[in-house]
């Protein structure tokens, strides 16, 4: 399967120059790109743009939000009409760092110690980005021209649902396969989906706190309600639906009950001198790959409207709903579509063979318990695999770390896959 002499030289180069790979991770981490607050990735993306231009890539860079640009670098294949193309995708933004967190070392000064590299974003996912870039540089160092197109995407906004990847798809970038180098501990993964939503209970009349007795006691004469208290019924209804889903729904690769409804944030009322005339609940729903977020939204709304009909006041003042969004920052909403993997596909079979050839171990296929931008690539019709270095429990954590051996092995596996995939003729 492999042109061993070429592959062996490439892999030896990675081993010989792993300090350069680690230095690249450190450079990327040194650009503080936490999201939120976001709007801080331009310098890091300019570095990546320059890096890719030196490799002979055609580079496209555009603002998704002010000071938050995407970068897409294309290595055009020598026979791109006949050979398979590949997208390497990753996000440059990282999880926020709170001042109260107790880091052993400064989070944006990545340090190497006892076989790990530590710093914000090393696992999620500047380690994966560095592996992609270093693999491309290794091909360039050996003057290897791939027959198929290689497209590298460094995108913004993943941490807050801003879907820089969706912007790439809308700009027309496509391929025969996409690999998202996000945190998967080098397992080949698909994922469930996530959608957030706002549920609002609103009274058309505002009551003084002094009239509460009239609202709740016999003979009070006022037909009104506290929006906060009515929201409590809806939360109870969500919990009942969540338990029902856990019993009645399942999906291969997921433990029972992964389809959750999280009442994540609530706000309501004006101040203590008023009966709360409005209450808003922000929820996060995880759903399975065989479901669509449109189906899930309909199911939740239908259930809560039935709950409301059982309440005399909410029967006349039903809750309203707002779903999804384009940004947790801009409009307080997000969608991450689900995607499944085809274990019999050429891509999965090739990646399995390469991993076994290089490590002597079978690579696992599974479903991620979190979400990535991979769903947007899949929704655009691109077969997609989540395959990247780092453990999920390290992502977003204080003292975030990545095992160096895993990063190096991932880089070698990815490099080999790039070479082999882009030398396969289109089906």
Swiss-Prot record:
EC number(s) on file: 3.5.1.-
Record's cofactor remark: Binds 2 Zn(2+) or Co(2+) ions per subunit.
Transmembrane regions: none
Residues noted as binding Zn(2+) 2 in the record, renumbered to the chain: 124, 159, 396
Protein residues bound to Zn(2+) 1: 91, 124, 182
Reaction catalyzed: N-formyl-4-amino-5-aminomethyl-2-methylpyrimidine + H2O = 4-amino-5-aminomethyl-2-methylpyrimidine + formate
MF term (GO), any: hydrolase activity
Top EC group: hydrolase
Keywords: Cobalt, Hydrolase, Metal-binding, Thiamine biosynthesis, Zinc
InterPro entries, per database record: ArgE/DapE, Bact_exopeptidase_dim_dom, Peptidase_M20, Peptidase_M20_dimer, Peptidase_M20A
Gene Ontology biological process: thiamine biosynthetic process; thiamine diphosphate biosynthetic process
NCBIfam families per record: DapE-ArgE, PRK08596.1
Protein name: N-formyl-4-amino-5-aminomethyl-2-methylpyrimidine deformylase
Species the sequence originates in: Halalkalibacterium halodurans (strain ATCC BAA-125 / DSM 18197 / FERM 7344 / JCM 9153 / C-125) (Bacillus halodurans)
């Amino acid at each position: 399967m492999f042109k061993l002499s070429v592959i062996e030289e490439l892999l030896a180069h990675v081993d010989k120059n792993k300090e350069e790979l680690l230095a690249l991770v450190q450079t990327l981490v040194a650009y503080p790109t936490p999201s939120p607050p976001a709007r801080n990735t331009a310098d890091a993306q300019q570095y990546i743009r320059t890096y890719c231009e030196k490799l002979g890539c055609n580079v496209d860079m555009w603002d998704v939000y002010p000071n938050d640009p995407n970068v897409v670098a294309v290595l055009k294949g020598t026979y791109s009409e006949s050979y398979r193309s590949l997208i390497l995708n990753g996000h440059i933004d990282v999880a926020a760092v709170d001042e109260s967190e107790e880091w052993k070392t400064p989070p944006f000064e990545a340090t190497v110690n006892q076989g790990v590299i530590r710093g914000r974003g090393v696992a999620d996912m500047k380690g994966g980005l560095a592996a992609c870039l270093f693999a491309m540089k290794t091909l360039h160092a050996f003057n290897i021209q791939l027959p198929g197109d290689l497209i590298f995407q460094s995108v913004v906004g993943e941490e807050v649902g801003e879907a820089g990847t969706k912007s790439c798809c809308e700009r027309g970038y496509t391929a025969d396969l996409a690999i998202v180098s996000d945190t998967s501990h080098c397992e080949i993964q698909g994922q469930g989906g996530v959608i957030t939503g706002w549920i609002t209970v609103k009274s058309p009349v505002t009551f003084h706190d002094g009239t509460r007795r009239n609202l709740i006691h016999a003979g009070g004469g006022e037909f009104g309600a506290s929006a906060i208290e009515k929201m409590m019924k809806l939360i109870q209804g969500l919990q009942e639906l969540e338990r029902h889903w856990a019993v009645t729904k399942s999906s291969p690769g997921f433990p029972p009950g992964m389809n959750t409804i999280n009442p994540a944030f609530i706000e309501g009322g004006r101040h203590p001198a008023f009966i709360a005339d409005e209450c808003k609940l922000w929820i996060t729903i995880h759903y399975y790959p065989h479901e669509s977020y449109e189906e899930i939204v309909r199911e939740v709304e239908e259930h809560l409207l039935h709950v409301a009909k059982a309440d005399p006041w909410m029967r006349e003042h039903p809750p309203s709903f707002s779903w999804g969004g384009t940004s947790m920052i801009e409009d307080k909403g997000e969608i991450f579509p689900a995607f499944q993997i085809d274990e019999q596909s050429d891509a999965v079979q090739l990646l399995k063979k390469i991993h076994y050839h290089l490590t002597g171990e079978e690579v696992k296929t599974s479903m991620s318990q979190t979400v990535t931008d991979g769903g947007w690539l899949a929704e655009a019709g691109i077969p997609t695999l989540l395959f990247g270095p780092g453990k999920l429990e390290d992502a977003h954590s204080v003292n975030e770390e990545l095992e160096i051996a895993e990063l190096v092995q991932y880089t070698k596996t990815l490099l080999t896959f790039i070479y082999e995939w882009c030398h396969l003729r289109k089906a």
